[in-house]
Amino acid sequence: MAVKIRLARGGAKKRPFYRVVVANATAPRDGDFLEKVGTYDPMLALDNSERVVLKKDRIEYWLGTGAKPTERVAKFIEQAGVTLPEKVKKEMEVKAKNRKARPSKKEDKEA
């Protein structure tokens, strides 16, 4: 069973709130999960300490068992001071290199 650490959306329309959860990779985005390991509230100010709240000890446990974080969650984990496994770091670097800049809307209209 492949396990991911990812965001599950909650909140109301135009007022998102996310739970950071550990879930089976095939489970629906907002569906069943194994454990809630944090929260993310994008509506709070960037400098607010409650914008991203993580249970570091549980995240370290799940990373140790082989759970893979999504890109966004991996950024949150690094900012919280938890070291990611080398394999995950390499995957993030490869994705960053392969990511292409999207053309601007002006370029789309001109073409």
Curated annotation (Swiss-Prot):
Pfam families, per database record: Ribosomal_S16
GO biological process, one term: translation
Name of this chain's protein: Small ribosomal subunit protein bS16
Annotated region described as Disordered, given as residue ranges: 92-111
Family to which this protein belongs: Belongs to the bacterial ribosomal protein bS16 family.
Superkingdom of origin: Bacteria
Alphabetized HAMAP family for the sequence: Ribosomal_bS16
Annotated GO MF terms: structural constituent of ribosome
InterPro entries on file: Ribosomal_bS16, Ribosomal_bS16_CS, Ribosomal_bS16_dom_sf
Organism for this UniProt entry: Rickettsia massiliae (strain Mtu5)
GO CC terms of this entry: cytoplasm; small ribosomal subunit
Gene3D superfamilies to which the protein is assigned, alphabetical: 3.30.1320.10
Assigned keywords, A-Z: Ribonucleoprotein, Ribosomal protein
